[in-house]
Amino acid sequence: MIIYNTTYSVSDKVYGSFLKWVKEKHIPQMISSGYFSEFKLSRVLTDEDQDGSSISLQLTAENVNAVSKWREQYGDLFEMEISSLFSVNVLYFSTFLEIID
């Protein structure tokens, strides 16, 4: 099992609408794709003063291949949607985490 982690840097001016979109649209789409089984949505705690907030979305998948298939099928649509909704107010990067225990 792996965790597909995406960390978002979210501007204060779109924070509320971003969380609403993630909870009501993005997470349900990810789970209903069949490639992910569980999720955790968290705020990243930092000591620094920064503009905006960092949000982590962790989705559990069977393996890296499942995430690759999701990216092939839905990755472009996700990128277009997040860009059209939030423009430069939301930036993100993704990483893979292997579940050890």
Please state what every model-predicted region is.
Residues 40-53, 80-101:
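Glycine-rich beta-strand-turn "strand-cap" elements at beta-sheet edges
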